[in-house]
Amino acid sequence: MAEKKQWHETLHDQFGQYFAVDNVLYHEKTDHQDLIIFENAAFGRVMALDGVVQTTERDEFIYHEMMTHVPLLAHGHAKHVLIIGGGDGAMLREVTRHKNVESITMVEIDAGVVSFCRQYLPNHNAGSYDDLRFKLVIDDGVNFVNQTSQTFDVIISDCTDPIGPGESLFTSAFYEGCKRCLNPGGIFVAQNGVCFLQQEEAIDSHRKLSHYFSDVGFYQAAIPTYYGGIMTFAWATDNDALRHLSTEIIQARFLASGLKCRYYNPAVHTAAFALPQYLQDALAPQPS
């Protein structure tokens, strides 16, 4: 039997993960990124950008449920949602499940990501691109949040790691723009990497976000193909009560929403804000 080709992730220099490649479905360099989608027997279809896994069919639900339902149910009455990135459509899929949301704007820098994901990762968007509340904007995320006249109740930054095109979505200019177009009491969330291996990202995001929001923190989830421990999600708002809502309040909102999830539930919601001590220590104010 011929040995299967292997694809090795290049996120870290000293160690990493690999996938057996059963079939390459798509591989092309766009103006912005090197995109590949291949099939793997364990994780289904896998998409990688610039040598780093972005999503797999097997475990994407964890990431997208936590990035979406935590801020939307904590907010309680979000009407207008902005997604930065998210070209695979799975974040949009989860937002559309909230029937009280009236408009969903998605800003994606690369139209190529959207078009090939619609073709090669159809389970991710699950038809959500056809939702009448949805509007796609092809633009740089930093430019959009600093120029738009729209305002939003929840902003979800589905960014890549802070290298290459994704680097701008970890800058003060981006965070300031998000604060600018966020309604009072609104919530901003963003993926912030695996904190055991990318702790400096969390520290840097916390420091920058604290210039613009009065309540800044993180919540977490364990996602198998984002290896190295828990993944952290940045959380920023000017309403500090939203991070400390009781499980009972979240439970009531969850039941009213009619959501059926595979990972998220109200107990997971409240527990997700409990962070390991090493991260708490890293984020604590340093003595002068």
From Swiss-Prot:
PROSITE patterns in UniProt: PABS_1, PABS_2
Annotated catalysed reactions: S-adenosyl 3-(methylsulfanyl)propylamine + putrescine = S-methyl-5'-thioadenosine + spermidine + H(+)
GO terms of molecular function: spermidine synthase activity
Listed pathway(s): Amine and polyamine biosynthesis; spermidine biosynthesis; spermidine from putrescine: step 1/1
Enzyme Commission number, as recorded: 2.5.1.16
Record has Cytoplasm as a keyword: yes
Record GO cellular component, one term: cytosol
First-tier enzyme category under EC: transferase
Domain PABS: 9-238
Annotated residues for binding of S-methyl-5'-thioadenosine: Q33, E108, D140, G141, P165
Gene Ontology terms describing biological process: spermidine biosynthetic process
Subcellular location(s) per record: Cytoplasm
Pfam families: Spermine_synt_N, Spermine_synth
Keyword set, alphabetical order: Cytoplasm, Polyamine biosynthesis, Spermidine biosynthesis, Transferase
Catalytic machinery residues: D158 (proton acceptor)
Binding-site positions, spermidine: H64, D88, D158, C159, T160, D161
Stated family: Belongs to the spermidine/spermine synthase family.
Quaternary data: Homodimer or homotetramer.
Biological role: Catalyzes the irreversible transfer of a propylamine group from the amino donor S-adenosylmethioninamine (decarboxy-AdoMet) to putrescine (1,4-diaminobutane) to yield spermidine.
Protein name per Swiss-Prot or TrEMBL: Polyamine aminopropyltransferase
Lineage: Bacteria, Pseudomonadati, Pseudomonadota, Gammaproteobacteria, Enterobacterales
Encoding gene, per UniProt annotation: speE
